[in-house]
């Protein structure tokens, strides 16, 4: 998971129940149902920008909208299946593949299509660290004790330190370290904001850091660095220990790459048809998503401000989403 982004202002996103774009709707835009459309908030910036944009659009179309904090992976088989969540806008192939398959199998959710950007999440290091570990980006360089020590901290030495995402993002980095025999200790960040604050501080000081970076996000555009090149992911890598270079353990490969998917409760289409059209047609390209996240994480704007500005600047686009059938 999983920004370009994730949230220095998650609390601000949750406060976004006061939605951007709350202008009074025209009478002709009266909704099909007054029941609230519940849009999921997760713990990174881009998804909450998207949630506020979608929520603001639907608010302008006359809908009752709630932004609902939710757990990223488990929401696929809990909130979305029960209707406690109506729609969620970012499930990444890189981390949520198993959860999406389980959600699909329930018959209670609908995959609305891809958001637009291609998803990538992997171990990443600033380019200046390559001098201390010249075999990079090949993952086998990390097995060299001298390379590991270059990434070590007092708490992990002689092991290198790998800063992973919050535990709720999963990603299987603990398993990856074990199956590939890497002399690294995985430390999970408490929040997305803390993770990227640590990155900024390390780069300012030219300190060692190896961490989970995902794209789309502003960080790989702002900072020069490289992703580690692990053995290529296949589905069997995560399910069959005999696959890959370690015949006794799974997860001996990199993370999968792929799409970012939108999901809805199966009843959205019949209860709120126009809102369903908006959600199904909703797209955002990678560059734009990175810029929006950077406005929050780097420029200090609130998610609500960023969402409202996008809604105001793109009215013809989102009205087209509302009028186009799915």
Regions found by a protein language model. Give the residues of each.
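Short, well-ordered beta-strand elements
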Residues: 31-46, 63-69, 159-163, 279
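A bilobed periplasmic-binding-protein/Venus flytrap-type ligand-binding module shared by bacterial periplasmic
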Residues: 120-132, 258-271, 294-295
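Short helix-initiation/N-cap motifs at beta->coil->alpha
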Residues: 44-45, 63-78, 187-198
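Pocket-flanking alpha-helical
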Residues: 51, 68-107, 198, 218-223
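Ligand-binding pocket segment of bilobal, Venus flytrap-like solute-binding proteins
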Residues: 85-89, 161-239
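An extracytoplasmic/periplasmic, membrane-proximal ligand-sensing/linker region
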Residues: 34-37, 46, 169-185, 189-206, ...
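A conserved helix-loop-strand patch within extracytoplasmic ligand-binding domains
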Residues: 108-162
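C-terminal lobe and pocket-closing loops
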Residues: 219-282
């Amino acid at each position: 998971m999983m920004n370009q982004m994730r949230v220095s202002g998650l609390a601000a996103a949750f406060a976004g129940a006061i939605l951007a774009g709350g202008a009074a709707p025209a009478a002709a835009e009266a909704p099909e149902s007054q029941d609230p459309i519940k849009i999921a908030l997760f713990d990174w910036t881009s998804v909450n920008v998207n949630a506020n944009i979608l929520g603001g659009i639907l608010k302008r179309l006359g809908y009752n909208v709630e932004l609902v904090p939710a757990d990223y992976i488990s929401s696929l088989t809990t909130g979305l299946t029960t209707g406690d969540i109506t729609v969620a806008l970012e499930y990444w192939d890189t981390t949520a593949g198993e959860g999406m398959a389980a959600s699909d199998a329930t018959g209670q959710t609908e995959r609305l299509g891809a958001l637009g950007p291609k998803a990538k999440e992997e171990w990443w290091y600033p380019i200046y660290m390559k001098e201390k570990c010249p075999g990079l980006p090949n993952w086998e360089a990390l097995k060299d004790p001298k390379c590991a020590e270059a990434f070590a901290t007092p708490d992990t030495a002689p092991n290198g330190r790998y800063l992973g995402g919050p535990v709720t993002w999963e990603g299987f980095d603990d398993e990856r370290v074990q199956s590939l025999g890497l002399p690294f200790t995985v430390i999970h960040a408490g929040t997305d904001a803390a993770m990227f604050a640590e990155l900024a501080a390390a780069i300012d000081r030219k300190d060692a850091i190896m961490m989970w970076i995902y794209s789309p996000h502003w960080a790989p555009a702002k900072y020069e660095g490289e992703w580690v090149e692990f053995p290529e992911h296949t589905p069997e890598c995560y399910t069959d220990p005999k696959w890959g270079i370690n015949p006794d353990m799974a997860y001996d490969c990199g993370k999968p790459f792929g799409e970012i998917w939108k999901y809805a409760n199966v009843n959205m289409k019949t209860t709120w048809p126009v809102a369903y059209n908006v959600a199904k047609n909703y797209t955002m390209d990678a560059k734009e998503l990175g810029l929006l996240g950077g406005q929050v994480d780097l420029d200090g704007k609130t998610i609500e401000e960023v969402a409202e500005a996008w809604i105001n600047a793109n009215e013809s686009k989102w009205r087209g989403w509302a009028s186009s059938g799915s």
